[in-house]
């Protein structure tokens, strides 16, 4: 900036040509006064340009600082977005695994229900047999028939207990499946909400 001011002063000085020597008592002092004013104006212009240069330099420095802050903020946001995407992917993977477990549990519950149906049918057949034996024993209370009756009755009681236990097991599995389905619905809702644009 100082070089620019010196160049400007040199240009102004070379532009002002010395006037021919005037006789004594001529306008020579006025020319020196004009030259002084020109130099003073050039100096003020140089100072003003120097001020503008410094202000512009300060603004550029501030803009560079702001740009650096903006870049860091963008980098931070990018990291946050990547972490959110990773968490969402992990959640989806967990959801898929839970869905597989729920399907397996559903298949086991269906198999248990089928077994329970078979046990119920077998118990009904056993009850029918017990009823027939009771009818037979009404007429004559025979020792061997009585023993067979007691054996069948014990088997019927045992199967009733087994049926009761299996029924409780199936009901417990159904409750667990209902809880897991509710939990899966909540996770799917959170995933759907997280996928919506902000």
UniProtKB/Swiss-Prot annotation:
Predominant subcellular localization, coarse grouping: secreted
GO cellular component, as recorded: extracellular region
Tissues expressing this chain: Expressed in liver and fat. Enriched in white and brown adipose tissues.
PTM annotation: Proteolytically cleaved at the N-terminus.
Gene Ontology molecular function terms on file: hormone activity
PANTHER family reported for this sequence: ANGIOPOIETIN-LIKE PROTEIN 8
The family this protein is said to belong to: Belongs to the ANGPTL8 family.
Protein name: Angiopoietin-like protein 8
Organism: Mus musculus
């Amino acid at each position: 900036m100082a070089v620019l001011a010196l160049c400007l002063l040199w240009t102004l000085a070379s532009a002002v040509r010395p006037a021919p020597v005037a006789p004594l008592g001529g306008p020579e002092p006025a020319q020196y006064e004009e030259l002084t004013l020109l130099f003073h104006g050039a100096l003020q212009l140089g100072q003003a340009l120097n001020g503008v240069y410094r202000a512009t330099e300060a603004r550029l420095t501030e803009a560079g600082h702001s740009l650096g802050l903006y870049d860091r903020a963008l980098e931070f946001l990018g990291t946050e977005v990547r972490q959110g995407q990773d968490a969402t992917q992990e959640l989806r993977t967990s959801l898929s695994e839970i869905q597989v477990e729920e399907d397996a549990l559903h298949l086991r519950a269906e198999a248990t229900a089928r077994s329970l149906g078979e046990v119920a049918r077998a118990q009904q057949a056993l009850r029918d047999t017990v009823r027939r034996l009771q009818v037979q024993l009404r007429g004559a209370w025979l020792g061997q028939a009585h023993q067979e009756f007691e054996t069948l009755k014990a088997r019927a009681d045992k199967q009733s207990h087994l049926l009761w236990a299996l029924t409780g097991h199936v009901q417990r599995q159904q409750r667990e499946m209902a809880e897991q389905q509710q939990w899966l619905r909540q996770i799917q809702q959170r995933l759907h909400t997280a996928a919506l644009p902000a």
